[in-house]
Amino acid sequence: RQMCIRDRYTVVDFHYAGGVKQVMKQLAGKIHTDAPTIYGDTTWGELLDSVKSAPNKVIHSLEDPVAKEPGLKIMRGNISPAGAIVRPTAVYEEVKYIKGAAKVYECDQDAYRAIMAGEIVAGDILVIRYEGCKGAPGMKELMLSIDALIGLGLDKKVGLITDARFSGFNYGAIVGHV
């Protein structure tokens, strides 16, 4: 299987390129190498001492990234001082900077009903709460509202903020894991 939709390399290629250990070796200056590994009796630093740094066509170095824009960014602000996640490459130019009225809903189903009833319009910021790890059981994936926005062509016109998680296939101004 491919590792990501636009990639030509498989998980087997990733394994032969050094796998997780090679990725961690490339990140050694950015991670806590004194942290224990899953094995419990070694640290990442001890484990990575035996790994030769060998960036290649599958696993790139930090100096030669696959993409200039990161796949994920952590955002902090008054809504989420502890942080939230956005996928910068998935945010349409039209909604990269959006300012509008916040419309707050207590669950995905309520927000979905509001979208379908025409209560959410271009320029609105849809806030869906209580769907994250402290709300819905199991931190479910937000789908109904996002799919409705896409289906109605509002994904390029409406912002969405939620404590839930969302699919890696979603596009638009979606801030999750608040």
Which residues does each predicted region cover?
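Catalytic or ion-coupling anion/metal-binding cores of large enzyme and transporter domains
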Residues: 2, 6-178
